Amino acid sequence: MMKGGMAGLMKQAQQMQEKMQKMQEELANAEVTGQSGGGLVSVVMTGRHDVKRVSIDQSLMSTDADDKEVLEDLIAAALNDAVRKIEQNSQDKMGSMTAGMQLPPGFKMPF
């Protein structure tokens, strides 16, 4: 390989690394909302999986033990929904960055 070709490859690799770092920061700061119970419970979470806010509809607030279990299940479901949305957002964004790469099916990037 000629000297100029290697320098070009190094420059491309550096540009790709910079784009990946920027994309990772955008993903980490992105906020998603997970919901359950038709919106009765919602959770706002960042790409870093930090929970920013939990909202519970007033209709779910009671002292009945059965309602408590339902509420716990709805909170767990909303959290899981938010995590799935973060994963999908990450796959979508990174997929557009790696579209030109010849990666094997199912290959996960280390981020």
UniProtKB/Swiss-Prot annotation:
Annotated disulfide bonds: none
Stretches for region Disordered: 1-25, 89-111
UniProt keyword annotation of DNA-binding present: yes
GO cellular component terms listed in the entry, alphabetical order: bacterial nucleoid; cytosol
InterPro entries per record: YbaB-like_sf, YbaB/EbfC
Main location: cytoplasm
Annotated localization: Cytoplasm, Nucleoid
A GO MF term: DNA binding
Keywords: Cytoplasm, DNA-binding
Family: Belongs to the YbaB/EbfC family.
Oligomeric form and interacting partners: Homodimer.
Function field: Binds to DNA and alters its conformation. May be involved in regulation of gene expression, nucleoid organization and DNA protection.
The protein's name in its UniProt record: Nucleoid-associated protein PSEEN1789
Lineage: Bacteria, Pseudomonadati, Pseudomonadota, Gammaproteobacteria, Pseudomonadales
